[in-house]
Amino acid sequence: MRKALTILILSAGFVFSQIPPIELKVGEGNLVDSIRLLIFLTILSLVPSILIMFTSFTRLVVVLSLLRQAIGTPQAPPNQVIIALSLFLTFFIMKPTIDKINSEALQPYIREEISDEEFFKRVEFYAKDFMLKHTRKETLEAFLSIAKIPKDSVKEPHEIPLRVVIPAFMVSELKTAFEIVFLLYIPFLIVDLVVASILISMGIIMIPPQLISLPFKIMLFVLANGWELVVLSLVRSYQ
């Protein structure tokens, strides 16, 4: 047992001795290259969270997911299709903001015309600009109150910190999404009520009304060109 432990310790020492040393050379004006790489990898790992927090993805995926429930087909389209459609629509909606970040922040940073700090400030400015445009005023004021930030101390909306803007934006997106879903539910609910009334008047109580109303709801949605109407309405709600 002691021999095995000794061999294990010596092997570990040999392995660690083979690891090349990491040199950190501090440059002038910018962060160390190694620190930059660490920051890049950290941001890359946070992409799913960033996608949800800073973009229109939340509203899109909630509306499209609950639309399936309204039609009566909770498994169709499948989640993969809903998420894929939401992603492409998100990139479509966010393109003006992405173009601004690319031209005003990323390209100057690549050309080494601005510092790391200025780069992050510009990215924050354009991301915050998008979120503030689609955040309800009352929701923003509520989160300012929770954060104990007096409204009088905020002269411009862009002075509000991200820790306030992000949750206010997400709550506003959820509220808007549920308002849209409520309006989408109404025509399908009417179809369910009409079918249920007809079945009861005919004395047919053993067959679930949803089973009969489902083909009519699908036909109504297709004839009204529902997918195009819903998608275009979602996109235009950000313009």
Curated annotation (Swiss-Prot):
Q: Where are the transmembrane segments?
A: 4-24, 37-57, 81-101, 180-200, 204-224
Report which superkingdom the organism of origin falls in. Bacteria
By its UniProt entry, which InterPro entries does this protein fall under? FliP (IPR005837), T3SS_IM_P (IPR005838)
Question: What keywords tag this UniProt record?
Answer: Bacterial flagellum, Bacterial flagellum biogenesis, Bacterial flagellum protein export, Cell membrane, Membrane, Protein transport, Transmembrane, Transmembrane helix, Transport
Q: Which residues form a coiled coil?
A: none
Q: Name one GO biological process term.
A: bacterial-type flagellum assembly
Cellular compartment(s): Cell membrane; Bacterial flagellum basal body
Topology term for the membrane: Multi-pass membrane protein
List all disulphide bridges recorded for this chain. Answer: none
| Major subcellular site | membrane
Cellular component per GO? Answer: bacterial-type flagellum basal body; plasma membrane
Purpose of the protein: Plays a role in the flagellum-specific transport system.
Which protein family is named in the record? Belongs to the FliP/MopC/SpaP family.
**Descriptive protein name:** Flagellar biosynthetic protein FliP
What is the organism field in this record? Aquifex aeolicus (strain VF5)
